[in-house]
Swiss-Prot record:
Residues 1-20 form the signal peptide. SMART domains: DPBB_1 (SM00837). The lineage of its organism: Eukaryota, Viridiplantae, Streptophyta, Embryophyta, Tracheophyta. The keyword Kinase does not apply. It comes from Arabidopsis thaliana (Mouse-ear cress). This is Expansin-like A3. PROSITE patterns: EXPANSIN_CBD, EXPANSIN_EG45.
Length: 263
């Protein structure tokens, strides 16, 4: 039954990608957050940590990218199109929030917005004055170098009744569509449910040290990634634990040939 539910989720995500087709080049508009405090209150629930990802190059994205939280942590390369103000490379941003505006696909941090400017003194500030600019963007793999996937235990967690976690530094170009948990050495797996944003939770918390398995959209199907390190028996809320593994897969979308390419 659990495998069937995973299959349904994977099919749903791929059917959504037919419309969004992340790997293709998208043309739209982008604005930026005028308040720095907004960066720490995003729908993905990364909190103040959000500004530490990719040197603060983060973004809120429209629902087709946010995907009810499955798009949290996804990376996109974005560049503005004004040749007088914008460089050709743009910048890479990580999705940390939901953008509900119908005016732009992306709302960037001001740091990311300025990074799209030509490297000429004062041009970045002039670009900010534009407020909203035409952009191109496409999804790219997230690269954290030698850093592993991390599991953060949320403050609401309390033994033995509730465990909430979120994944940090998720690499590759894919989505996590399921998380299972079990005592170390046991085959009695129980599933966690997405609570909100990047947060997964369960009210059936096994005792002792815990192991995870993550189901991701790898290739054209789901793939299981097993944690090589465990959540210790004395886990604490607010702590971050190394999963001992990194996700490097790139999901293969079932969409048609892209109409535009990045060049």
């Amino acid at each position: 039954m659990r495998s069937f539910l995973y299959l349904i989720v994977v099919i749903f995500l791929f059917s959504s990608s037919v419309n969004a087709c992340d790997r293709c080049l998208h043309r739209s508009k982008a604005s930026y957050f005028s308040s720095a405090s907004a960066l720490s209150s995003g729908a993905c629930a990364y909190g103040p940590m959000a500004t530490s990802f990719f040197a603060g190059h983060i973004a809120a994205a429209i629902p087709s990218i946010y995907k009810d939280g499955a798009g949290c942590g996804a990376c996109f390369q974005v560049r503005c199109k004004n040749p007088k103000l914008c460089n050709s490379k743009g910048t890479i941003v990580m999705v940390t929030d939901l953008n509900t505006s119908n005016q732009t696909d992306l709302v960037l941090s001001s740091r990311a917005f300025r990074a799209m400017a030509k490297p000429v003194v004062g041009v970045d500030k002039y670009l900010l004055k534009q407020g909203i600019v035409d952009v191109e963007y496409q999804r790219v793999p997230c690269n954290y170098g030698k850093r592993n996937l991390n599991v953060r235990v949320e403050e609401a967690s309390k033994k033995p009744n509730y465990l909430a976690i979120k994944l940090l530094y998720q690499g590759g170009q894919t989505e996590v569509v399921g998380i299972d948990i079990a005592p170390v050495g046991s085959s009695q797996w129980s599933y966690m449910s997405r609570s909100h944003g990047a947060v997964w939770a369960t009210d059936k918390v096994p005792t002792g040290a815990l192991q995870f398995k993550f189901t991701v959209t790898g290739g054209y199907d789901g793939k299981t990634v097993w944690s090589k390190r465990v959540l210790p028996a004395n886990w604490n809320s607010g702590r971050i634990y190394d999963a001992g593994v990194q996700i490097t897969d790139i999901a293969q979308e079932g969409c048609d040939t892209c109409g535009h390419i990045w060049n």
